[in-house]
Amino acid sequence: MEMSGLGRKRVSKWDSKEDTHHHHSSVNANSASYYRDKESEPVRFNAESNGEARTRSRVSQNNDNSYFSEQDGTRQQFVRRSGSRSNSRSRSRSRSPVYRARRDAGSYDRHKTRTQVSPTPIREFNKRGSDHLFDQSRSDHYGWEDNIRKPRETKYHTDDFREEAMMEGARSSDYNNTDYPEDNSRIRRRRSEFTGEKETQRRDGGDGEGGFHRSSNIPCKFFAAGTGFCRNGKYCRFSHHVADRKQPQDNNNNFYRQDNNNHTSGHNKWNDVERLDNGRVGGIEVSRASKKGVSESKGNGSSSWIDDMEMSPDWNYGVQALKKPVKEDHSVGIIGQSSQSRVLKDDQRSSGMFSHGGRTMAEKPVAASHQSYSNSVNVAPVETFNQNHNALPYQSSLTAGGSQQVLAAAATNFSVGSNLSNLESGKVYQDNHHSTVEKPVLVQNTVSREQIDQITNISASLAQFLANGQPIPQLEQALQLPLHSESVQPNQATTQSNVVSSNPNQLWGLGMSTGAEGVPAVTASKISNVEEIQEVSLDPKENGDKKTDEASKEEEGKKTGEDTNDAENVVDEDEDGDDDGSDEENKKEKDPKGMRAFKFALVEVVKELLKPAWKEGKLNKDGYKNIVKKVAEKVTGTMQSGNVPQTQEKIDHYLSASKPKLTKLVQAYVGKIKKT
């Protein structure tokens, strides 16, 4: 206790002596120096050597007698810093002045230092150089970054610190204080101002840090840098629990804010999406949005029906972002296991809906991702529909009936109860024409086994009809009729519940006609558009109509030989239809280009057929023109407006097939004109 008392007297004496100098109360001690004081205090005294500060570096320097004198400011500052302690530790440790440390230091104390202790703070101070306090006085604010950016402030140094200390002192001071320590009074005065202010603040608790922290509470500067790595490893004296400690206030907004709802930079962060390690329930990995993205939808009667579905592995395709998020209440969806496990391993935010067991979970924020949806309704097995590849903003909901579909407003006009032509064309008929599907898309299909069998039978019957070239009943009527109540209009949401018809020529309740995996070869991939269907299906009928009309007349003429009555009947029929022909001619003038091109090609064929009679002189000019006109009107009159070949290739094919019939018709007209 004697030593402690003597140490306190010395401290008070030095304080009163230094107060005669310029003592600025406005100077605030920085946080970096505060932490260094805290860090260095446990090293300065040794209980085994009667509480006297004995260090290896101090002995070597003092024996040299070239670095510091007894009145050097460096010594004063160190003693002042070592003596500035709280009352709780002053009774247990001595505050003996520096000359005792110099006198008693020896080889015994070199080996009696505390275990696992770094070199002492005087060594650290010499390593930093004499400009250390000047650098601090010139800076405006201090924080963790001051310690981070100065690699010389580490507490573990090499043995060549004496040379570096001399170089640093010579570089940063006005005089070389290692050679002329007594003359450098300005440096001593400035250091004493800082140390006096520091001690006053620490005695009075001016820092707001009332109690003294142990070395274990002092954060390690390497961990404070955010690297998570300390080069001293487990032998480091300082705390590595930096993440649990509150950071300085000036760095709060930079790197410490970990709030789930805080997006400082305006973009999505990964703390919005929490990856559940224990989310592997039944082989399905679950990714949920944090705190507000996950909602459980409790649908009416939404039982565990996902296990009954047949999952296909290759239905994962790109989906654009939906304009509206899917409703949380009563919404049900499916995600295949293969695509889900693939998507959730990406670094993107996955969203959508999935169902496991009896619980259906929906992720509210719908974002664009490489994820496919098959929003199907828990309905009767008759009625299903699949997602279009353009990701149209429709939603599926469970109504009270449990077997109805609702498509949202502004959705495209899906022909749910479409007929054969809509199915084969692979198109979705819409009013706005902004999402036409030209080819089948592999999507998840949810159909029952009965429906697959029915569709298989229907497709087989269709293939037979098309192969045999037989006219399909009700096809012409279906093509000409506009879409009626069976298709959902874009501006109103209607519910529908259709039943599969027993007629194999009609396909009802097939939902979207884009083709699906569960439907085997619905001929959508074979036929590209409606026009080809019309030609394939109706051209045999047209040819048959023309063949029957013309062949009946020609066969009657053959049976009677050159019977003039029959020939006159044919011509009379044409003459009776002259008035109608004039009207038809007016209509033909308004026909589109396709009809005109067909007419011109037909006229050329008729002229070629009339050349022999014209050369033989059997026809005059007027008769020639009349025959050409009547034959053209006769052929085009039998054709329906929607069945006229449009391209030149189709026109040539049609005329070459019907050339024998045209020849007989032209001969009948020539015979009629001869007899007149």
From Swiss-Prot:
This is Zinc finger CCCH domain-containing protein 38. It comes from Arabidopsis thaliana (Mouse-ear cress). Residues 251-262 have a biased composition (Low complexity). Keywords: DNA-binding, Metal-binding, Zinc, Zinc-finger. Residues 563-583 have a biased composition (Acidic residues). It comes from the Eukaryota. Residues 1-134, 172-217, 245-307, 487-506, 533-594 are annotated as: Disordered. Residues 12-21, 101-110, 124-134, 192-212, 269-278, 538-562, 584-594 have a biased composition (Basic and acidic residues). GO terms for molecular function: DNA binding; zinc ion binding. A zinc finger (C3H1-type) spans 214-243. InterPro entries: Zinc_finger_CCCH, Znf_CCCH. The keyword Chaperone does not apply. Residues 58-79 have a biased composition (Polar residues). PANTHER family: PROTEIN FRIGIDA-ESSENTIAL 1 (PTHR36886), ZINC FINGER CCCH DOMAIN-CONTAINING PROTEIN 38 (PTHR36886:SF8).
